[in-house]
Amino acid sequence: MPNKSFLFYAACFSLSAYGFWPFNDGDQEPFVFAENGQAKAAIVVRTEGRAAGYRYAANELADYLGKMTGARFAVVEQPVDGLATIRVGTAYRAAKTDELHIEVKSSDLLEITGDDALGTLYGVYDLLETFGCRFYCYDFEKIPTTNRLELAADYVRTDAPFMIHRQQLAGVFCENGNPQVNVFSRKHRMTRELEKTNDFAAVRYLGLQQVLCTYYVSRQKFLDEKKHPESYHPEWYALRMDGSRCPHTLCASNDEMYQQLFAEIEKDIVEKGWREISLGDDDAWEMCYCPGCRKITASDDARGNGAQRVALLNRVARHFASRHPGVRFNILVYGHQCPVPAERFRLEPNAGLSFALLWRNHCRPVACCERIGTDVTDWLRLTDKPVEIWDYGCSFFCNAMPFPNHDIYGENFRFYREIGVNGIFSQVQYSTNGDLAELHHYLFSRLCWDPDADDQRLTEEFVKDVYGPVAKEVLEYLEICRHARDRQRWWWGGCYAGATDSWLTAEDCVRIHQLERRMKNRLRREAASPQRIHADRARISMLYLAGSRYDDMMAAAPKMRVKLPPKGELVEEYRQLFEDGLNRLPWYGELGETFYANACIQHMRHIPETASSEPAGKPAFVRVSAEELDGGERRELKREADGTPFVRLDPKPRGTEGRGKLYMDPSKAECGVTAGAARKGTWYIFGTVRSETPAVSEEAAAYLGLYLFRPYVLDTHTNFPHDEVVNMYIPGAKDMRNWRTYCMGKYRLYEKSRVWVMCGIINPVESVDVRELVFVNPDCFDDEKNAQTFAGAGQVRASKGGRQLTDGFDKFRYWTLDEAALTNASPSLVCTFTKQQAQAAHVFARVRLGATAPKSAKAGRLVLATPATKDKPAVEVASVDVSGNPLDDGWQIVSLGCQRIEPGMTLTFMPGEGGKLRFLDLRSVHLLPVEMFAGKGNGGK
């Protein structure tokens, strides 16, 4: 029998979704569920309406209350004499979809209800969570026990999600023959199963699927002349510029195609009851070039591919508007260019939008992405209706690979709420064998219901409860990953990236390996339990990292006095955990987009068991002049008046010819250098660029990036041999004439890796010029002993409240102004140059800041100035704005150009005009020899 007392009163001081309720006046009796193993209440279930759903909710409540109290709760249709009543499914008028309502009416009556049977079920789970139950994973729940369970007499709670559709493409939520899975998806309040059942609510279909040419007007039926000559209609599909037909896009002007499409949609509405219909393309963004579609495109001032999509959507919507007035039709905006002007392309009242935001850094909040304007904001002008999102939350290269994005869900969902999103479908780690996959699933489900929930508290609670004896190590692992992600601001975590060495150092890998060994040793002493199963699962990504980076670990481990086990032992442990039936192996590579289990193991076995090393005899720097840069078709070698060569990239047209999508094409306006044997190894990478735009300013007029070639790619996964690991956007301005040097950070290059510059495509750009790419040896750049070229924390002074700290992992010193210190007068961090540092040099500052406003171009400011004297005030020599984003807190190396440094000159880092900051940090200042870069005048204003 339970022997712990669990009295719950705290909820009466909580806030509901719509406000707060009165405090207990002290003389009312609480509602008592059970005491000393005896039920004090019976559950009365509603029998009208969706009776099966209400009874399911009542049975769930009875089951969990029984587990908590040891009592047996009756589920009946009428109140029972001598027992209080818990009414499940009372008649209720909900204000919002999926709303729940819980209210203690008296000491004898508690009502749990909501929006239909589903809202009632959510009310049951909400109450159980209030009592401390946690539904973490399909095979792990936390259920507290008590001798007496009661609820305050004035307890009232009303809550509702901001999203109507909440779906994850995850094995623990999909229908796969395991009845536990569907039950679990309800506890996480996911709505995917509502497409298949109406026991709880009306069938609810999320209208953002890729269905055109696959499900509707299927190419298998209408574009396969060999198999189906009788139904062959190539004219129904988009005509390409070369005369071929696109199997992924429909012709938006063919009347016969529309008749077929109308018939197929009508059947689904009538026979399946669908109320939301997707008209999303099949992973495509091509345009049709037939005469009819050319007229549609000509009506669009942007001349992009969006007008044809809108024309198709609106025609379908108009056709069904009177016949099926309650049905909504959506297109899936997947890189399509928004037609202009918005007034000409407004959507029909029964038409809507959904977005697939693929091209972005998925380890930073979505609001940080500079393409949000063209990908989302511009399109929102076409409709006043809520929109839907196809989201991404993992690496498609390998689900087991560490992927540092667990802390961005709340920020993302708050942004989605702000722009009016009411539905989400996310491709997260499909298998529980992913990188702490179930933690990601849990955070996703909690935060897409309530974006304002404390994600840090949710994370810590989950880790401590689920991983139990190894919770400390798991939290340390998350912190290592967060720190590694923030080492360099411009690291880019795309969803196809597979190169962990672009952000995790060899030392990081050894630290994580040590955590995993501690976890393994501790678990040996633990008896079999759900916690142990999940703790072993948590080791999977750590073991994958050790196997895939074993050569790097061999180089770092001796310096850290760590002895590594044989690689084969680690791979075998990984295989055993991966193939354990409890870890859902069959659901790993669900779409062929990720490594399958065996390919992961082969990949690890392919890694050499010899320590990686830097090439011997690396020079201090390698400068690649414009004359040495190769690249795409639209580039031209030109010269300045003084003869300095540069490459001019022609950014017009922005869209890729024949496709209409706005994306950067390496075969067009691109230049760069592909690493050969001479450029292998680790370098700080710089590019000197200038960009001119029609607008006064443009945040992403050009990009400096890195495609990292992976040397151990297997034949099983050659689709993505290059990882895009840096994507640094470069601002431009009208009539820009000055060169600016940009640093993407420090990266290890393999042969065939490519450093590149491309034109931006978000808004029109006049020109992008590239003068050079420079590779600087870290031994030169980070030489703290060279007082002539390196100014560290010892040369910095801070305004009131500033503190000098030591980095917890990399052990460098830096100065910080926290949020409180930034409220003082004139907050700043100032480096003063010495006599020894007097020279002509290219000046760089390594800084970071915590912006609160997305895409803040002027979050901080660096100013180089002469010292003030009795006779002269300080004179600004150069200055530069420092940009920032929320949760984009990485260190960045910022150029102030080639300058003449004199003793006593100062470099000041201060807040800019971009809004409130959470912190402001200065780590070091670097003075590089001018001969590394061509000419003078790089950077500062």
Model region roles, listed by residue range:
Residues 758-765, 909-917:
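Short beta-strand-plus-loop segments that form exposed binding edges in beta-rich domains
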Residues 447-686, 693-709, 729-735, 740, ...:
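Catalytic domains of carbohydrate-active enzymes that cleave complex glycans
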Residues 249, 253-257, 267, 371-472, ...:
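Structured mid-domain segments that build the active-site/substrate or prosthetic-cofactor binding neighborhood
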Residues 18-102, 147-156:
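Acidic, contiguous N-terminal accessory segments
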Residues 314-340, 387-394, 426:
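Aromatic-lined carbohydrate-recognition surfaces of secreted/lumenal glycan-active proteins
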Residues 52, 56-60, 64, 93-280, ...:
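Feature activates predominantly on carbohydrate-active enzymes
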Residues 714-752, 872-902:
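Extracellular carbohydrate recognition and processing domains
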Residues 604-651, 774-809, 933-941:
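Extracellular carbohydrate-recognition regions
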